[in-house]
Amino acid sequence: MSELKTTSLYDFHLSKKAKMIDFAGWSMPFSYDGTLKEHHYVRNSAGYFDVSHMGRLRLSYSQIEEINYLICSELKNLENTKALYSIFTSEQGTAIDDVIFWKFEDDLILICNASNTNKIKSHLDINSITYEDLTLTTDLIAIQGKNAINIIDQIMTIPDKFSTYKENNYIYARTGYTGEDGVEVMIDTKDTVDFINMLETKGVKPCGLGSRAVSYTHLTLPTTQVV
């Protein structure tokens, strides 16, 4: 059995007594205080999720025509600083992965499911699209919940829904997969623990992937295999 990959927050999760599981080849927190309790954190207040197992690729804006050809949405005409949910398809029209694009003036951030990251990278390689893999040099933290935006507003600029923003060391979008409002923040690994500690001082609770799965299943949100 191959060794599981870990995010930069692995030791942090252990210090929080998280229940760790094998999730698409990554050792990830399933729960901290219990799945149902964490689900209610998000529904009633705010929680944060480590979703750094998800693939993060930076692509040059100059390749947008070629990228547009590979997905089932119109990316090239999307306004800059917007986020787009889409699906990469094969030549036969089958789904390879459901993904999120964050569009900026000079580049694109592509976020894909952990189980399909290598498939997406291979698909891009085959189609001669170059990218920078940020998966191991950054973390991705989702802050979600009824009060999430009020809390985040104390820390950073709040973009419109489905919009993106760059500020200081943060690259983020007002997106998520729980059915509640919030943001997903990409941040250098060296800064993540300080960022999370700041969230916790404002009452944001750690939540595992179990409660995240409950949230999107409860709302019948789609996902390609596992995230």
Regions found by a protein language model. Name each.
Residues 217-223:
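Conserved small/polar residues in nucleotide/adenosyl-binding loops
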Residues 64, 100-216:
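Acidic, low-complexity central loop/insert segments
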Residues 38-44, 88-98, 125-127, 165-172:
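Short amphipathic beta-strand starts and helix->beta connectors
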Residues 1-89, 94, 210:
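Acidic, proline/glycine-enriched N-terminal capping motif
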